[in-house]
Regions:
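Bacterial N-terminal signal peptides that target proteins for export
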Residues: 1-8
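N-terminal signal peptide c-region/cleavage motif recognized by signal peptidases
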Residues: 14-18
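Flexible, processing/modification-adjacent segments and terminal tails
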Residues: 21-29, 33, 40, 92-163, ...
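N-terminal mature ectodomain segment of secretory-pathway/periplasmic proteins
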Residues: 22-101, 134-137
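Short amphipathic beta-strand/extended segments with alternating polar/hydrophobic composition
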Residues: 62-66, 85-89, 104-111, 199-200, ...
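Gly/Pro-enriched, hydrophobic low-complexity segments
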Residues: 79, 147-246
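Hydrophobic beta-strand positions
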Residues: 88, 95, 140, 172-173, ...
């Protein structure tokens, strides 16, 4: 027992030393420098990412678009049929129901929470203080076999069941390369409400002077499986027709 306590004390001391040697401002600024610089990020008008998502033995084509206006969509192709998910036109949030194959509008609460993402394009950490966010180092953890700084980011509150709720996410930065390798967040709505979602990033490649992760993996902490995504191309400042975001009119 004494040995276990001694090990725990050493681990805590080491973690504290590592964290104190680097400030959260240094981590965030170094990260932004490593992926191309804050000014280049702030000049972005939009991104279009195309690739494939692995679902079991199937590879599903996927396309993700996000604009600085807040408009966004994710389009997935399943056996030749296209399904749009999390489509936001600036006012309405909607998705195609996989079972009925019909468009459905999201709840007012989900739409409000989703709309807050406009403030975070292309990166929630850009000008985070000016946005009123708070960031702090809460330790180090091992992510995919490598040490990473764990940064707690507190953003503007969201609504959960009609009540204003703290919006806290955890960002993990590789201690050597100082790039983002994982984001941890709580699922706030839907059948997985209350679960912890992990989004992992890797394979950073340059696109017109900025570096983006060409590999992502979305998973629920403690659950088997996941949804690895491999991007084949990333286009900056794409031209996208407004109709791509509009809720389909009734036939």
């Amino acid at each position: 027992m004494k040995f276990a306590k001694a090990i725990a004390a050493v681990t805590l001391f080491t973690t504290s030393m590592i964290a104190s040697a680097t400030s959260v401002e240094e981590i965030i600024s170094t990260y932004h420098e490593n992926i191309g610089g804050v000014e280049a990020l702030k000049s972005l008008k939009g991104v279009k990412m195309s690739g494939v998502m692995q679902q079991g033995q199937m590879e599903l084509p996927i396309e993700y678009v996000q604009l600085d206006s807040g408009k966004t969509y994710t389009k997935i192709s399943v056996q030749g049929q296209e399904f749009k998910q999390a489509v936001y036109d600036g006012e309405t949030l909607w998705s195609i129901n996989f079972m009925t194959m019909k468009p459905e509008k999201s709840t007012e609460e989900d739409t409000y929470n989703f709309s807050l993402q406009k403030n975070d394009f292309p990166d929630a950490l850009v000008d985070y203080k000016a946005k009123g966010y708070g960031a702090e180092i809460v330790g180090t953890e091992t992510v995919e076999g490598a040490e990473a700084f764990k940064v707690k980011l507190t953003q503007e509150p969201i609504k959960v069941d009609g009540k204003e709720t703290p919006n806290v996410n955890y960002y993990y930065f590789d201690a050597d390369s100082m790039v983002l390798v994982m984001v941890e967040s709580e699922v706030r709505s839907g059948p997985m409400k209350g679960a912890v979602q992990l989004v992992k990033f890797s394979d950073y490649q340059e696109v017109d002077g900025l570096y983006f992760p060409f590999s992502m993996s979305q998973e629920i902490k403690g659950a088997p499986g996941g949804a690895p995504i491999s991007f084949k191309s990333i286009e900056l400042n794409p031209t996208v027709d407004a109709a791509a975001f509009a809720f389909p009119s009734a036939e």
